[in-house]
Amino acid sequence: MSDQFSGVKDVSEHLKFDLTHLNTYLEENLASIGRVLDYKQFKGGQSNPTYLLEAEKGKFVLRRKPPGSLLKSAHAVDREYKVLTSLMDTDVPTPKTFLLCEDDKVIGTQFYIMEFSEGVIYWDPLASEAEKDKRKKIFDEMNKGIALLHLQDINKIGLNDFGKEGNYIERQISRWTRQYIDSETEKIDSMHRLIEWLPKKIPEQKYTSIVHGDYRLDNIVFDGSNNSIAILDWELSTIGDPLADFAYHCLLWHIGDISVSAASEIGIFSEKEYLENYLRRTNFKLENDWNFYIIFSLFKVAGICQGILGRVRDGTASSDFAIQMGKRAKMFADLGWEKAKKIL
């Protein structure tokens, strides 16, 4: 799996851009990095094409909207740039940002440039690339990162206007329902059942924070000592319910059906231990809503996968892996509905 996603490759033909145009723009707006001499495409990153820039003053990362017809509100690189820039002076590990370009004429779509965070990305959700006795450290760093994010004061860091406060789950159900319907390639019965069931079961939102929206192991860069140094892929970030964000992050234990004994054998925390560590770090209280949050998260990831499949249909997906990922929509929706039926 790591070979499929790790590192860079020659840029796909439909994702190439004019380097001369970029350099002309950078000369006026970001001369400090020098001229860009070459660029490659990162293998990972199915949604927003991401490039490694080889510039005169070092390596940098350019992340852009994909070309073509796009779903409304999708591929929001401007939002990524805003949240990353706001978090730069906090203890949340993020790459430094340099520039946002909203002029489509430069390389064809909006883009931003940030520092290149050199380190290790574990592409397997269980960190199988690491030795067994290192995995709990990796997972604890991951746990610490999301807790730090959820503890940020949105007013203090200037993100109070980054999204609407309250009714986060309701708005998310509406968003992913629209994305699913707009992208539907075949009717998934369990998805339609969840669309009907979820709005009736929404718990009271007790906390409000910045949420990442897609926080998982392969969106984190680690250094050689397995300290988290950069959280990536902020496209879905907004103001919302941190418990929902954390539940989405915990889908690993449900999709993989990882029991306490299995977690011990793998060398990671059980879900209960991992959840308790997060609640200890944040001092949040969780009543009896965890099952709902997990079901909602399965619905959300099904909507994301269906959106990817819709982009394959429309010819705007940026990776061959997108086809495989998109076909998982039914699996996630079916699992969510099976769990929902147990608490009807």
Locations of the language-model features?
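ATP-binding pocket architecture of kinase catalytic cores
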Residues: V36-Y207, D223-N226
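Activation of the activation-loop gatekeeper triad in protein kinase-fold domains
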Residues: L232-S237
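Helical subdomain adjoining the active site within ATP-dependent kinase catalytic cores
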Residues: L286, G303-L344
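Catalytic-loop of the protein kinase fold
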Residues: I210-H212, L217
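Juxta-kinase regulatory segment immediately upstream of eukaryotic protein kinase catalytic domains
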Residues: S2-I33
